Design a protein with these regions (language model features):
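Long, low-complexity, acidic Ser/Pro- and Gly-enriched intrinsically disordered regions
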Residues: 1-98, 104-105, 110-386
Length: 386
């Protein structure tokens, strides 16, 4: 180590370029990529005549030179991140990529990891992948292996509000597949105790068919609280997706459990599994009209006007997802015109998608919403040319 100090000292005075090249080469050799990052900024500051005491700080950079130093900062951060990834140190790499808002290289590195990691590494990766949203679905897969379903459900519930809809959907798919596989394996084991020569590979639906005895005496084959949560998560999955039918099978299984094992939800999901069977059948276009009527009846029969918007929200969501936009607009105009634009169902966006700007204008006028009415005018198609 002492040799490098001598080498640096022997570089001719005034040859700063050679000095920094020698320094960088040594830091790369030592795999000291944090100091390599600092050295790149020190070099740029030296070239600009700036103080060198705090090489990585931007606080001592005049505004006129800030853009130049920031460009070097980004390049140096990218270099350090790449080197840390090559060394297999994802958390250290993320320190740099996070600052420059380039998550993809880290997401790609996390994607390449096996689903089972050493316990000493998994927590840091989970923090980055799931809680910081770099690769949530891989985070879910890792957590299922490391901590099991219960902890993963809790983590997903905590993280879901910070995830983009596509990320939330991918995580829900992973949860559905995991629980479906576990439940199918458990039910198959129970059936094989009575039918030793049961052929492998049957679906959960096939295994349950004609075997009501599976549920006798309050019997169950998976943690029922896990089943409840995963079926709820599955509502975020958009068709077409194989996982929707898997979720339907989970709901069908749940509907056969003893009533004491069927935990209710908020209306219209108070009859939890029966309602979810209808919900997933709408998405799968299996008896869609009957399934939609179930939710319409729940809305019509609700005595409390304050509770009707949530029931209408579910029905409008299903109508939109099954491309029935005109009835969705009519229902939304009645119950959801004041809904937050951050919600899944936006009244204004629905009107635009359905080509019903006239309804948007009518509702905003009735509400004395000048801003909304102006937006509707601006969104209106131009009149046909004469």
């Amino acid at each position: 180590m002492a040799q490098i100090f001598d080498e640096l000292q022997q570089i001719p005075a005034g040859d700063a370029q050679a000095l920094f090249e020698c320094l960088a080469a040594q830091l790369k050799s030592d795999k000291d990529y944090h100091k390599l990052f600092d050295s790149r900024l020190m070099q740029r500051k030296y070239e600009l005549g700036l103080p060198l005491v705090k090489p990585a700080s931007l606080g001592d950079v005049p505004e006129a030179l800030r853009k130049t130093v920031e460009e070097t900062y980004i390049t140096a951060a990218r270099e350090a991140g790449e080197l840390f990834l090559a060394a297999g140190d994802i958390p250290a790499a993320w320190m740099y990529y996070q600052v420059i808002r380039e998550p993809k290289p880290v997401a790609d590195a996390i994607e390449a990891l096996p689903n089972t990691l050493d316990h000493s590494k998994v927590e840091e990766i989970l923090q980055i992948a799931l809680y910081q949203g770099v690769h949530p679905v891989k985070g879910i897969q890792l957590m299922l292996k490391a901590h099991g379903t219960c902890s993963t459900i809790t983590a997903f519930d905590q993280a879901t509000s910070n995830l983009a809809p596509e990320q939330r959907q991918s995580c829900a798919k992973a949860m559905v597949r995991s629980l479906y596989n576990d439940l199918t394996e458990s039910v198959q084991s129970s059936v094989q105790k009575r039918m030793a020569f049961l052929p492998p590979g049957g679906s959960l639906r096939e295994l349950m068919s004609g075997r009501d005895w599976l549920f006798e005496g309050g019997n169950y084959h998976i943690d029922v609280s896990h089943l409840n949560s995963v079926v709820r998560f599955a509502r975020t999955i958009e068709p077409p997706a194989e996982e929707i039918d898997l979720a339907l099978q989970l709901a069908e299984y749940g509907s056969q459990l003893d009533s004491q094992l069927q935990y209710g939800g908020e209306a219209p999901f108070d009859d939890f599994y029966a309602a979810h069977v209808k919900f997933f059948r709408v998405l799968l276009d299996k008896g869609r009209a009957d399934a939609l009527q179930y939710f319409q009846d729940r809305l019509d029969q609700e005595p409390d006007e304050q509770d009707k918007p949530f029931l209408a929200y579910v029905l409008v969501d299903l109508l939109m997802r099954s491309q029935q936009l005109d009835p969705a607009v009519t229902l939304a105009a009645k119950y959801l015109s004041n809904i937050n634009t951050d919600a899944r169902v936006s009244f204004a966006e629905l009107c635009q998608k359905a080509g019903r700007i006239d309804v948007w204008k009518q509702v905003t006028r009735e509400q004395n919403d000048l801003l909304g009415y102006t937006a509707a005018i601006l969104a209106s198609p131009p009149p046909p040319s004469a």
